[in-house]
Design a protein with these regions (language model features):
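Active-site ligand-binding patch in enzyme domains
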Residues: 3-69, 74-221, 234
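C-terminal folded domains that constitute the principal catalytic or ligand-binding module
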Residues: 228-229
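Short active-site-adjacent structural elements
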Residues: 235-239
Length: 239
């Protein structure tokens, strides 16, 4: 089985330029935030980070995007996400800063959304927190689980590679992975996947989700729950 890879990113040469900072706005967000703890490495090498409290009807989502100086986020002949930053040969330290910030954002997240086609283009991707110190501070300072939950999203399940590296991570790593799809996607997964997939749902309304028992998601790391929303082959993103 596969093990998660960890390493410590050297921070002495991190190039992180804060373009604009408003202490007033930051303090307002901090007061309204569900969590106000700041990981020590983030405070030392970056700045305090706070996230707005999630609305009652949906999670708070954010993204990390790396662009080249001419505005490109991927190559036409190779859509793999990390290539733009990784191939910054003129300024490797800048590339390192991009990767560290990505790990910071992952460390603050409860879940990481992974498109099924991303798995197809990146055979070794896991979307866990690679930085060892951030992994530890995430648990000790933020009180979060060892790793954020991976959430694979697919309309109909047909584009999910069930032999991907991510589905064979050793349970001792405590890396949880779930799939979010439509009713038709769930049918396809149950008929074609060799893996263990407890089905949660289908959910047609937000109220259905509120009454669902999702507590067992983290009890079996050999299982990959399928969370079903919507109707037919159309999942309901609002749910």
């Amino acid at each position: 089985m596969n093990e998660l890879v960890f390493f410590e990113i050297p921070k002495q040469n991190l190039k992180i330029q804060i373009v604009k900072k408003s202490d007033e706005i930051l303090e307002q967000i901090r007061k309204e935030s569900a969590e106000t703890a700041v990981m020590p490495d983030v405070a030392q090498y970056y700045t305090d980070i706070y996230f707005p409290k999630a609305p009652s009807d949906r999670p708070y989502t954010f993204s990390s995007i790396v662009l080249s100086s001419d505005g490109k986020m991927a190559y036409g002949d190779n859509p793999s996400g990390p290539l733009i930053a990784k191939n910054n040969f003129l300024d490797p330290d800048g590339s390192l800063g991009d990767f560290w910030v990505l790990n910071v954002l992952r460390a603050y997240a409860d879940g990481i959304i992974i498109g099924a086609r991303t798995l197809l283009s990146e055979p070794g991707i896991t979307c866990h927190v690679y930085e060892e110190r951030l992994t530890r501070q995430r648990r000790e300072v933020l009180g979060k689980k060892y790793q954020p939950c991976g959430v694979i999203v697919s309309l109909d399940g047909t584009d999910i590679p069930f032999d991907h590296y991510i589905f064979d991570v050793d349970p001792k790593e405590e890396y949880k992975l779930v799939i979010a799809t439509s009713p038709r996607g769930a049918e396809y997964i149950m008929a074609n996947s060799p893996l263990k997939h407890p089905v949660i749902g289908p959910f047609k309304t937000i109220e259905d989700v509120d009454h669902a028992d999702l507590g067992e998601l983290y009890t079996d790391f050999n299982a990959f729950p399928v969370i079903v929303t919507g109707q037919g082959e159309n999942p309901d993103t609002k749910v």
